[in-house]
Amino acid sequence: MLILLWGLGSERPLIAVGEELRRLGAPTRLIDQRDILHTQVFLGVDSGVGGTIHTRNDRIDLSTVTALYLRPYASCALPAIARAGPNSAEWRHAVTVDDMLLSWSEMTPALVVNRVQAMASNSSKPYQLRQIQRFGFSVPDTLLTTDPSAALTFWERHGTVIYKSVSASRSIVSRLRPEHVVRLGDVASCPTQFQQYIAGSDYRVHVVDTEVFACEICCKADDYRSPGQHPIKIRSCRLPQDVEDRCRALATVMQLPVAGIDLRQNLEGAWYCFEVNPSPAFTYYQNATGQPISSAIARFLARNSQSMDTSGQSFKETDWRAHLSIGFSP
């Protein structure tokens, strides 16, 4: 049994889960992206995929990994890699390591929180909204367009609208204001998502397996994640049972053992769902409310890791060349 963490060793959610796993006494290793130039991956392919990860001070047999908690960033964006540039050996190495570990995470029989294929829906917000509607949540009227006149018509119809990223790339949700009219022409070069503004109270819901942690956010900013001068209050709360059940079912069907769900209850009491985050930075809410989200994730990883059998994925290093051997050293 071995639980593998992959991402930036300085990232708070990764630190929090790692601390809880150690408190449980669960065998845990970290693949720290900050040390990617000293990380090598070797994969062997036969009836399954196995191999080893070599770091500066460690060697990890992937056949022993029974659970994986992944929060990787694009390693090519790390300062040392970005400075070296796309044509450098450092860049090629970083991209290769990322690709190989992501590929392995899709094929391993180990528990993965969360698999890349399950997280993919977040790369298309309109597609994800269609999934959300199936679970009885209201969704705002939405326009995805490169037509400035269509955007203007949509704005005039709803009176108040917001604009946001179409993809998984983070953006600050903002309301369209009169001074933005001169910029509407820019959408011709950038597909932009516009949504009907829904007045009401914000809720963030974290689902961990079957556990649900909800909190209410009070803030007058368009996007409470970037409140500016607006005060913000976050408090733990309990959702109506049917809303809690829908959140749990939504995460389950989307195959996301850990998910962050953004809700808003409008002034008439209807529940709107804006999106499902497949890799939530839950520590922001945990620190504000004291909710034991990192503990729940650690317990889920450890509990499922104990029942996972990956023994059939073992490969001997001397046998790899008969199958497929891939490794890169800068």
Question: Residue spans of the language-model regions?
Answer:
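Extreme N-terminal starter segment of soluble prokaryotic enzymes
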Residues: 1-4
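Conserved N-proximal alpha/beta basic substrate-recognition cap immediately N-terminal to
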Residues: 8-20, 29-138
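Phosphate-binding site of ATP-dependent enzymes
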Residues: 21, 154-244, 250
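Short acidic-glycine loop/turn motifs at beta-strand connectors
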Residues: 45-47, 56, 207-211, 266-269
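Loop-centered beta-sheet repeat module
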Residues: 121, 125-172
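Protein kinase-like catalytic core scaffold
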Residues: 161, 213, 259, 272-274
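A long amphipathic alpha-helix within ATP-dependent nucleotide-binding catalytic cores
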Residues: 224-271, 294-305, 309, 317-329
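Glycine-rich phosphate/pyrophosphate-binding beta-alpha loops
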Residues: 277-289
